[in-house]
Amino acid sequence: WQYRERISESIRSRTPYKNDIAVRVSQVPEFLHKIEQLVGMSYPDFEIVWFGHIGDGNLHLNILKPAELMAEQFKKQCEQVNDSILLVVQEFGGSVSAEHGIGLLKKGQLRFSRSDKEIDSLKLIKAIFDPDGIMNPGKLL
């Protein structure tokens, strides 16, 4: 377990761009291959480190910054490929947030794994319990 816990620490110096995604366990091999191809075609110098909870399809995708690339440029390039990654998640019927929730950062990404009707239902549920929008402002639930 210590090895798993230290993965994030071991790649921290490489400024990882992170995603917390999930697909069905039976789809994991094909999904990994497709994402590796997608990122490799767009940015062949990017290294990917995968870890997570493979037994339930929860995958932590970490794209590592090449040493010669400035952090701002790396982030911009990762953001450019991120929607394509999320389209693959959508294609596989996966989730854009496997275990860490949606929050403010991933709110715009929810459309890749939930329908408009489902998102509207979440908003409706929140409005029932928080009609004035004072609890968890800006969040769906």
What is each model feature region?
Residues 4, 11, 25-27, 106-108, ...:
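Solvent-exposed, flexible loop/coil residues
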Residues 64, 69, 105, 113-115:
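Generic secondary-structure boundary signal with a strong preference for alpha-helix termini
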Residues 73-77, 81, 102, 110-113, ...:
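Short amphipathic alpha-helical interaction segments
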Residues 107-141:
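Activity-critical C-terminal alpha-helical subdomain
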